[in-house]
Design a protein with these regions (language model features):
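Alpha-helical residues within the helix-turn-helix
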Residues: 22, 33, 51
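DNA major-groove recognition helix of helix-turn-helix/homeodomain DNA-binding modules
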Residues: 44-60
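A short, Lys/Arg-rich alpha-helix, primarily the initiator
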Residues: 1-15, 19, 23
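Recognition helix of helix-turn-helix/homeodomain-like DNA-binding domains
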Residues: 25-41
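Residue-level signal for the short linker/turn that defines the boundary of a DNA-recognition helix
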Residues: 15-16, 41-44
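Short amphipathic recognition helices of helix-turn-helix/homeodomain-type DNA-binding modules
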Residues: 60-66
Length: 66
């Protein structure tokens, strides 16, 4: 499942998915695969993204990741 709300948040904060991937320390392939729903996120991935995207409200986490 593609994550359109997640992609929007990434673009709003980092301007490109590539810049977000660089900031989080992921390969370009992993970043695009996660954002496009081709790779499942681990709990660690979600935790890293929440920190970088300033997400701390459970409702917002639900919108971004589930």
């Amino acid at each position: 499942m593609p994550y359109s709300y997640l992609r929007g948040r990434i673009i709003a904060m980092f301007h490109t998915v590539k810049a977000f991937g660089k900031a989080i320390g992921w390969s370009q392939r992993k970043t695009y695969d996660i954002v496009n729903g081709r790779q499942e996120m681990t709990g660690k991935d979600i935790d890293q993204m929440c920190k970088l995207l300033n997400v701390d409200v459970p409702e917002e986490m639900r919108l971004l990741f589930f």
